[in-house]
Amino acid sequence: MADNIILECTECGDRSYLSKKNKRKHPERLSLKKYCPVERRATLHRETK
């Protein structure tokens, strides 16, 4: 059962990515390095609540 999650930039707070994750298999928060259009560079994006 995959749920939609929102990824938020840790530096500017922009929420520009949507992803899916199985919360039963991976209960910890997801962190990915992705491109931030506001910062115009790759930054760390974390799963929001």
Swiss-Prot record:
Recite the UniProt keywords alphabetically: Ribonucleoprotein, Ribosomal protein
Q: Which InterPro entries match?
A: Ribosomal_bL33 (IPR001705), Ribosomal_bL33_CS (IPR018264), Ribosomal_bL33_sf (IPR038584), Ribosomal_zn-bd (IPR011332)
Give GO MF terms, alphabetically.
Answer: structural constituent of ribosome
Keyword set includes Ribonucleoprotein: yes
Q: Which Pfam families match?
A: Ribosomal_L33
Task: Kindly give the PROSITE patterns that the UniProt entry links to this protein.
Answer: RIBOSOMAL_L33
Membrane: is it a keyword of this entry?
no
Extract one GO BP annotation from the record: translation
Q: Which SUPFAM superfamilies match?
A: Zn-binding ribosomal proteins (SSF57829)
Per the record, what is one GO cellular component?
A: ribosome
Record's HAMAP family? Ribosomal_bL33 (MF_00294)
Q: Which family does it belong to?
A: Belongs to the bacterial ribosomal protein bL33 family.
The protein's name is Large ribosomal subunit protein bL33
Q: Which organism is it from?
A: Lactobacillus acidophilus (strain ATCC 700396 / NCK56 / N2 / NCFM)
Lineage, top ranks: Bacteria, Bacillati, Bacillota, Bacilli, Lactobacillales
The coding gene here is: rpmG
